[in-house]
């Protein structure tokens, strides 16, 4: 490698390839404990496959849920744009052009999901309405200058094709420092004149729209925009509306009333507002659960505690469906990482194939499962010996148990949906209004042992004929869609109930019931009145049930039998640990982290995170090789409300130089003291940044301590 040169220069040489750090594949990090590398790689690949399938299903579901909303928005924009073209040719319609078409899009308080929705909306508008779609956020537009700057700069990037982009580059550079509505109007006229509608008609449905495509401005978080900025922009835009078609979309998280609170009547009258409501986040979550968890399409499941952690974060923190899905992904990852037998958490044919190739260690892992041990204890003594000693017999039995678990899930979700059809129509919703609430209860315990279930049966025995028939028709559709399952006979039984209800002669029943009733009470004293009431009560008890009441009782008993037979908790099923993730504490540590406790642990015991053996120390001791901030933090824990900086600095220097022998009069010692002093200042500044201390006006050479209790 020659470095000779006629002039001074900097020479760069690539390092030796042998010295480069070789990065390990991801599946190697997936290995834990004594598990075999081949098995860890297979588990990682299975995790990736299942997550990719769940992710694709969620994306498809998201598009399906947004389709109706986006279609209505696109129809509104196209209608507003056609109105602009019509009025631009009509002199009498110039007054209407003062009103800006505005779509008020209410998305709910799940703000973290809005970016995904607006991204999909922007793509849909660019594909169906106009290429000129701009998304603005309040943090980027503190005043009118920045508002116009962001608006125009984004619009100039929205070029229709490469040719127009090249032609516009000259004009953009000439006016890049001048942002106003006049420049925007001039730019729009230039772009629309240069755009060839014949070339672009292939990309859109009608070429007439491309002669003057609208400019769509999306304000993602309208509540956060400054009132003056909004008012000025709307007033100025209304004056230029005859020059280019402008359409506004307000992203609203709270309520449409915010429009009238932010904008006075003189400004809001310049808007032609139409309201659009997205699906509520709770309904969205219910749909996601129904498609991802309440199905046999995906083998992975979570138990009641994990589901409770995820739903609590959703309900009490952010209402974010995307964060819920991320938590579900983390649960999937933790399950495949921590459970060696998760290699069998796949579709049933593949799981049966993998069972034949299980190693001896994996067979022992199966025998150690609590659910399998309970299953073995219930078997005969000969079968117990075979399960514990014969590997081949164990694999055959494992295949059978996994097949039974698959059938259990199919029946479980069918009966769960059927029960939800009944409970969701009852007053006060004893078992919850959403199916996720019913699912949580069924996962936790035997639902028929709860008081809420008893009240449900009591209310079902009071349903009218029309209500009961409506619910049975819904249940019939649920079971009819799974005829291949042995529960398909249940659909025939429900169909028989419906036929019996339709054949009832209500008129005759009412006449018979009215004929058996006693005559009306006459005026009498208290004694005879009480006697008559007692006779009526006894008569009501001994009264024969009508055909409808008998049939209704049969329906309730039939549903009760289904629930008791098929809605058993998952913990009762052998090998449920293979597909169910139950480590709720691990999930809570990741998703519900406590920053203050983590900070205290890191500063008080750096070995906990750094895993450096030299940092190990007895409780109460301060190792001198610990990070400076850790030393300063442990010293500040020994102080009271006010900390003397001089004393703190001396104690810090004493700890740092504890293992070093230096001459106090040497030049090296003075340089070392300066370095230690600088390190102390940096450590104190870091503690102040973290919020442990703050300056105080009581004493200039002191700082105030802000935390107590060791965390």
Curated annotation (Swiss-Prot):
UniProt keyword annotation of Electron transport present: no
Top-level taxonomy: Eukaryota, Metazoa, Chordata, Craniata, Vertebrata
Cell compartments where the protein resides: Nucleus; Chromosome
Protein name in UniProt: Origin recognition complex subunit 3
Record PTM Phosphoserine, positions in chain: 23, 516
Subunit architecture: Component of ORC, a complex composed of at least 6 subunits: ORC1, ORC2, ORC3, ORC4, ORC5 and ORC6. ORC is regulated in a cell-cycle dependent manner. It is sequentially assembled at the exit from anaphase of mitosis and disassembled as cells enter S phase.
Cysteine-cysteine disulfides: none
GO terms for MF: DNA replication origin binding
Single Gene Ontology BP annotation: regulation of DNA replication
Protein family (similarity comment): Belongs to the ORC3 family.
PANTHER family: ORIGIN RECOGNITION COMPLEX SUBUNIT 3
Function per UniProt: Component of the origin recognition complex (ORC) that binds origins of replication. DNA-binding is ATP-dependent. The specific DNA sequences that define origins of replication have not been identified yet. ORC is required to assemble the pre-replication complex necessary to initiate DNA replication. Binds histone H3 and H4 trimethylation marks H3K9me3, H3K27me3 and H4K20me3.
Domain of life per record: Eukaryota
A cellular-component GO term for this protein: chromatin
Keyword field: Chromosome, DNA replication, DNA-binding, Nucleus, Phosphoprotein, Ubl conjugation
Species of the source: Homo sapiens (Human)
Ubl conjugation keyword on record: yes
Gene label: ORC3
């Amino acid at each position: 490698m020659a470095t000779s040169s006629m002039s001074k220069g900097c020479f760069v040489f690539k390092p030796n390839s042998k010295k480069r750090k070789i990065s390990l594949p991801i599946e190697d990090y997936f290995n834990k404990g004594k598990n075999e590398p081949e098995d860890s790689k297979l588990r990682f690949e299975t995790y990736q496959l299942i997550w990719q399938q769940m992710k694709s299903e969620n994306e498809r579901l998201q598009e399906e849920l947004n389709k109706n909303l986006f279609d209505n928005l696109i129809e509104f924009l196209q209608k507003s744009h056609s109105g602009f073209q019509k009025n631009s040719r009509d002199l009498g319609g110039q007054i209407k052009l003062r009103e800006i078409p505005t779509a008020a899009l209410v998305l709910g308080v799940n703000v973290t999901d809005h970016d995904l929705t607006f991204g999909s909306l922007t793509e849909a508008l660019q594909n169906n309405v106009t290429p000129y779609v701009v998304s603005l956020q309040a943090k980027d537009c503190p005043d009118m200058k920045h508002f116009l700057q962001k608006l125009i700069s984004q619009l100039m990037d929205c070029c229709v094709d490469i040719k127009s982009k090249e032609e516009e580059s000259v004009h953009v550079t000439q006016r890049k420092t001048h942002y106003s509505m006049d420049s925007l109007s001039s730019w729009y006229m230039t772009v629309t004149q240069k755009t060839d509608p014949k070339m672009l008609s292939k990309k859109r449905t009608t070429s007439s729209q491309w002669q003057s495509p609208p400019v769509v401005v999306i304000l993602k978080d309208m509540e956060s925009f400054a009132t003056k900025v909004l008012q000025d922009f709307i007033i100025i835009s209304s004056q230029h509306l005859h020059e280019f078609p402008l359409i506004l979309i307000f992203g609203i998280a709270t309520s449409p009333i915010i429009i009238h609170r932010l904008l006075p009547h003189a400004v809001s009258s310049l808007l032609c507002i139409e309201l659009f409501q997205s699906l509520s986040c709770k309904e969205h979550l219910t749909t996601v659960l129904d498609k991802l968890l309440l199905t046999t399409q995906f083998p992975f499941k979570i138990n009641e505690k994990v589901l409770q952690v995820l739903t609590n974060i959703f309900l009490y923190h952010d209402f974010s469906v995307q964060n819920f899905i991320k938590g579900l992904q983390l649960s999937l990852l933790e399950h495949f990482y921590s459970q060696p037998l998760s290699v069998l958490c796949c579709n049933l044919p593949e799981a049966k194939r993998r069972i034949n190739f299980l190693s001896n260690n994996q067979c022992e892992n199966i025998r150690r499962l609590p659910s399998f041990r309970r299953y073995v204890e219930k078997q005969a003594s000969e079968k117990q010996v075979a399960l514990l000693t014969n590997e081949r017999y164990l694999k055959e039995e494992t295949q059978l148990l996994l097949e039974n678990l698959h059938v259990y899930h199919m029946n479980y979700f069918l009966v769960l949906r059927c029960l939800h059809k009944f409970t969701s129509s009852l007053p006060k919703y004893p078992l919850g209004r959403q199916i996720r609430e019913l699912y949580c209860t069924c996962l936790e315990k035997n639902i028929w042992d709860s008081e809420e279930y008893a009240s449900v049966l009591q209310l079902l025995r009071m349903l009218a004929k029309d209500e009961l028939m409506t619910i049975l028709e819904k249940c019939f559709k649920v079971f009819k869609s799974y005829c291949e399952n042995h529960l398909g006979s249940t659909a025939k039984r429900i169909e028989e109930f419906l036929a019996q209800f339709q054949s009832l002669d209500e008129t005759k029943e009412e006449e018979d019931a009215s004929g058996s009733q006693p005559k009306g009470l006459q005026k009498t004293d208290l004694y005879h009145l009480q006697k008559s009431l007692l006779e009526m009560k006894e008569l009501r008890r001994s009264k024969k049930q009508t055909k409808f009441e008998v049939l209704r009782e049969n329906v309730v008993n039939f549903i009760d039998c289904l629930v008791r037979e098929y809605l058993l908790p998952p913990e009762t099923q052998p090998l449920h640990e293979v597909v169910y993730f139950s480590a709720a504490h691990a999930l809570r540590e990741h998703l519900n982290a406590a920053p203050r406790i983590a900070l205290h642990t890191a500063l008080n015991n750096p070995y906990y995170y750094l895993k450096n053996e030299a940092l190990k120390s007895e409780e109460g001791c301060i190792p001198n090789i610990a990070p400076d901030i850790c030393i300063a933090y442990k010293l500040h824990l020994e102080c009271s409300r006010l900390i003397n900086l001089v004393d703190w600095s001396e104690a810090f220097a004493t700890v740092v130089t504890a293992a070093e022998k230096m001459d106090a009069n040497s030049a090296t010692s003075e340089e070392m003291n300066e370095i230690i002093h600088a390190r102390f200042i940096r450590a104190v500044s870091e503690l102040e940044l973290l919020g442990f201390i703050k300056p105080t006006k009581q004493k200039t050479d002191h700082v105030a301590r802000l935390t107590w209790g060791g965390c």
